[in-house]
Regions:
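Receiver (REC) domain switch-region micro-motif
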Residues: 5, 66, 283
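Active-site beta-alpha loop architecture of Rossmann-like, nucleotide-cofactor-dependent enzymes
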Residues: 12
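Rossmann-fold NAD(P)-binding glycine/threonine-rich loop
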Residues: 15-83
């Protein structure tokens, strides 16, 4: 009987996410939970902790499967499999699930009549869709992608994709591609939120507070409407489906983060990718996608290189490697503010970054600190 563990945690809680989002925003850069500078710092805080969990698993449950939801899911899963050597790990995300719940309705079909093929990495993947006769339905989906209910998670501002671009690649991008394909529009919206009502993290902290108050009611029998404001829809569906497939050897088609093994030809076999896979008692068997178009191949290789640098920095505390990851990330502007954002985030998160201790002490000695009032208040109160 297989043993299965799930992980979903946030080192530093939402106060850490607030810093991740506010400090880059102060310098005109996108602050986002799993993308850009904020996403990299979430990885810096999280990867050492998942390593500690793996050490506990070696002692307590050495044959267990780890089903990881913890963001950034792809990088955490890669650290677990490649660097901590725990091969029985699958990374999950709700973004493909949300898309596959919404898109069949746009095509007037049931999900059972469609064949999905995903390729990419977590929060940076594309997909194609075929009907039961092998007809490519991707162009039809592209025409509907900007409609409400088109499969974009609730936490992503729905700036309109340029349809000509998507028809040229003939693939459907995930909602997070908006941060890359329409960077300026997404940045302007983020700055507007930053100035008016606080960052997404601050909004979610208020929602979390409201939910905890609601959950005090032992007579609660219905789903609170506040849950709809969060971006975690269908996580439970994905989790139960994956666990069922492993436990009962069901051979279910899912989109997961797993070892590439040739599924995407332009990436190394041991890279962790987010692809269509068959899940069974032996884990995830990735399904071949083949060659990506030239432009998307370039994007993907750059983003994978950025992830690898981020993971190495998280494991070693190498400041130069962290800066290299920053320079590679398209959402981090390469100008005089690049190192300012990196340095201020390091100091702001010192409590959760022991691997960077020496560099942080050096930065503090130079007087580096955030001037953002919300961040300063959090730090004054020990957060």
């Amino acid at each position: 009987m297989p043993v299965l563990l799930t992980t979903q945690f946030r080192v530093g809680l939402l106060d850490a996410r607030i810093k991740d989002e506010r400090i880059p925003s102060l310098y005109g850069m996108l602050g986002q939970e799993t993308n850009g500078a904020g996403g990299m710092f979430k990885a810096f805080r999280t990867i050492p902790v998942i390593g500690q969990i793996i050490e506990d698993m070696r002692e307590l449950c050495p044959d267990a499967w780890l089903i990881n939801f913890t963001n950034p899911s792809g990088m955490v899963t890669e650290a677990v499999i490649k660097h901590f050597g725990w091969k029985k790990c699958i990374g999950l995300c709700n973004v493909p699930t949300i898309a596959m719940m919404a898109e069949p309705k746009l095509l007037g079909k049931d999900i059972s009549q469609l064949n999905y093929r995903y390729a990419g990495i977590n929060h940076f993947h594309w997909h194609k869709v075929f009907d039961e006769n092998g007809n490519d339905m991707t162009p039809i989906l592209i025409d509907h992608i900007n409609e409400k209910g088109g499969g974009t998670p609730a936490n992503i501002y729905q700036a309109e994709f340029p349809l000509e671009l998507l028809h040229s690649m003939n693939m459907v991008p995930c909602g997070y591609h908006r941060y890359y394909y329409m960077k300026q529009a997404m940045l302007e919206h983020a700055i507007e939120e930053f100035n008016e009502g606080g960052t997404r993290a601050e909004q979610m902290k208020q929602v979390e507070h409201e939910l905890f108050e609601i959950y005090k009611n032992a007579e609660l029998h219905e789903k609170p409407e506040q849950l709809g404001k969060r971006g975690g829809a269908y996580y439970s569906d994905a989790a139960c489906e994956c666990i069922r497939a492993i436990y009962a050897n069901k051979k279910i088609h899912m989109v997961v983060s797993t070892q590439n093994n040739g599924a995407i030809s332009c990436l190394d076999d041991d890279s962790i990718v987010e692809v269509s896979s068959i899940i069974s008692a032996t884990g995830a068997q990735p399904m071949a996608f083949g060659k990506l178009p030239s432009a998307e191949k370039g994007w993907l290789q750059m983003m994978k290189a950025m992830e690898e640098c981020t993971i190495e920095a998280a494991l070693t505390g190498d400041y130069g490697k962290a800066l290299e990851a920053f320079v590679l990330n398209p959402l981090v502007e390469n100008n005089e503010n690049t190192t300012k954002v990196l340095d201020e985030l390091l100091v702001a998160h010192a409590k959760y970054l022991p691997q960077f201790k020496e560099k942080i002490e050096e930065l503090k000695a130079k007087g580096v600190h955030s001037t953002d009032p919300v961040v300063m208040d959090l730090m004054e109160h020990g957060h």
